[in-house]
Each structure stands twice: as C-alpha cells, then as structure tokens.
Amino acid sequence: VSLGVAIKGSEGIVLAADSRVTLGAQHEGGPRFVVNFDNATKLLTFSGDENKYIGAVTYGAAVIGLRTAHSYIPEFEVSLGAGNRPTVLKFSKRLSDFFLQRWNEEMPKDYSGPGMTFLIGGFDPKDAYGKVFIVEIPGHPAPIQRNPGDKDFGMTW
C-alpha cells in the first residue's frame, strides 16, 4: 500500500509520501516474486524559478513500464520549457498529459492494476491560499481541484 497526502491549510500546503515501492513479477506457470524498495522518491519538485511554487506527490502504481514517476521528471521539465509562471491548474494539466502519454506508450493495453495518482499542490500568483489538484493516470486524467476556495481547507489522500 502506498501513501500520498496533501493538506491545504490557511498557512500553507503540506505534501507528504511514504518511500516504499513494491514490484512484482511472475513467469507463466511459476511463482510470483515480490520485491520491496524503501528508498523511492515520491515527493516531486521541479526546477526553474517559475515552477518552484508547485510540488507533487505520487502514489498507486509504482512504475510506468520500468520507470518511476521521479525518473521522468527531467523529461517533463524539458517539455515545460522556460517562460511564465504557470497556474497550478495549467501545471496539473501538463503533468497529467505528460504522464498519460508515457502510460499509453509503455503500459500493456490489458493492464488491470491500480493507476498512478498525483496530488499537485502550489500557489498561483497573487492568491492568498494554495490550490490542490488530483490526477489519476490513466483513469481520470482531468485535474480535479480539492478543497476549492479561500475558506475550504482540508486533507486529500
């Protein structure tokens, strides 16, 4: 079980995650092998001054193909390019589009396990309070805002 949490409070946003990744493999007709790693990076930060106000947490499916979400971040950052500071919603859409494309390229069409979930939190220019969005790849890629508004604070997991 993987854990990711986003808390939107009146004094800021908290993003947290565990660090365990569980991977399994099975040869046809053979036993299933399960391996645990306790050093995965599931709290994602992004380079560039325009992106330092946004972070993300991932949980659910540990990998897309053979790679963790964290291993894709350099490619995602290149796809962002340099420029103006994005809103949290726009950033969430771009993150979702990027990972949905990778999922469709790498994952088997008949995959029936859990998806990869992202909680994206950050601050828009001139807003007093942060925003949190949830994205589920591949099932629900459209970002959904959690605890919207200036008086709705709470936790998402």
Show which residues each predicted segment covers.
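N-terminal nucleophile
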Residues: 1-157
